[in-house]
């Protein structure tokens, strides 16, 4: 039995034991709440755009806002900026978006997490300031210049999602016919620079052939990678048409020590294939945990990013305590829920950013 098989067996055993609990074992849910979350539970959202995109006549997503992050007592959230639609002048516009987030720190509203010691472990002291993981989604504006990664790092960026909605010089995406054949030579140089600086590499949106190349670099350098916002596909052949991951892909991430983060996106195919409730979300988390280990599953809402559909009764991150309750209902132990809600991502952060 290898390490992966051993961890999987441990996960199955833990889940089976948890499923046998009585309602009395779940009293911690009602007796220790603070702002909706159990007291002391570390909560980190691996992917969100809080107040990043202004509302227009065509788009308005307030599912993650700084106000709600503070009200619910979330320890930290990703603040991901995007500028990959128009390459011309994209890097300078990207810098401008990052400076807008950095201005929030100057106003005392957030604490940008440049090192693990910046994470606020307690979310309710007087004058609480939530942590912010400064992130870039879509590395197209970086073009082929690794020095631009250094510039982002100096600003405080600690997470980069190389791929987004368009195929770029780094690799292929999940939602278009691949044309690069995987991670390119330039892409390899860019990812290696991210890793060397201490930037978390997020392979959300990356096609499986690009994921394979990034995962290989991660294994060689002994660092974890993440997919910050996805869920389990129901398709037998998912590749090229969906943002959802198959177990094969999740396993690649887990083998680096990384985390697959699930989101509140809702969908319905038929009565046997649907994801429409908090209970469905929790059951999916259990299924993934049984396959790759609970230590490799986490939370990433994509709040503010305009998900096309949400599960029922999810309006914003203020509803996340309902997921905690649903995960308890399907059999997760308190320690496992805590790992999912933020502990696993914090482990990745400690290993990557120092």
Regions of interest found by a model, annotated:
Residues 145-149, 209-220:
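Distinct, well-ordered alpha-helical segments
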Residues 180-215:
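Loop-centered beta-sheet repeat module
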Residues 215, 220-231:
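A short alpha/beta connector and helix-capping loop motif
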Residues 105, 190, 198, 205, ...:
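Sec/Tat-exported extracytoplasmic proteins
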Residues 2-20, 25-178, 225, 233-235, ...:
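N-terminal hydrophobic targeting/anchoring segments and the immediately downstream early-domain regions
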């Amino acid at each position: 039995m290898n390490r992966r098989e051993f961890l999987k067996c441990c996960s199955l055993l833990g889940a089976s034991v948890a499923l046998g609990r009585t309602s009395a074992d779940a009293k911690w849910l009602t007796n220790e709440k603070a702002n909706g979350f159990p007291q002391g539970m570390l909560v980190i959202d691996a992917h969100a755009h809080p107040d990043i995109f202004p509302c227009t006549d065509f788009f308005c997503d307030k599912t993650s806002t700084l106000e709600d992050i503070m009200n619910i007592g979330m320890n930290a959230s990703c603040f991901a900026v995007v500028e990959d639609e128009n390459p011309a002048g994209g890097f300078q516009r990207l810098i401008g978006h990052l400076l807008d987030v950095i201005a929030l720190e100057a106003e005392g509203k957030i604490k940008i997490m440049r090192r693990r010691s910046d994470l606020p472990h307690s979310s309710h002291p007087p004058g609480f300031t939530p942590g912010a993981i400064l992130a870039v989604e879509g590395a197209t504006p970086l073009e082929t210049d690794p020095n631009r990664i250094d510039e982002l790092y100096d600003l405080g960026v600690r997470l980069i999602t190389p791929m987004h909605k368009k195929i770029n010089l780094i690799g292929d995406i999940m939602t278009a016919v691949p044309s690069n054949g995987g991670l390119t030579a330039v892409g390899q140089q860019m990812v290696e620079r991210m890793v060397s600086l201490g930037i978390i590499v997020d392979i959300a949106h990356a096609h499986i052939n690009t994921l394979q190349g990034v995962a290989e670099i991660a294994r060689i350098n002994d660092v974890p990678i993440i997919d910050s916002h996805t869920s389990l596909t129901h398709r037998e052949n998912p590749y090229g048409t969906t943002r959802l991951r198959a177990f094969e892909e999740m396993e690649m991430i887990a083998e680096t020590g990384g985390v697959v983060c699930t989101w509140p996106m809702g969908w319905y195919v038929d009565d046997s294939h649907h994801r429409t409730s908090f209970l469905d979300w929790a059951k999916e988390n259990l299924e993934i945990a049984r396959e790759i280990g609970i230590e490799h599953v986490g939370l990433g809402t994509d709040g503010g990013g305009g998900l096309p559909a949400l599960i029922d009764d999810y309006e914003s991150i203020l509803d996340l305590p309902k997921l905690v309750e649903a995960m308890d209902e399907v059999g997760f132990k308190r320690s496992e829920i805590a790992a999912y809600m933020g502990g696993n991502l914090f482990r990745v952060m400690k290993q990557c950013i120092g």
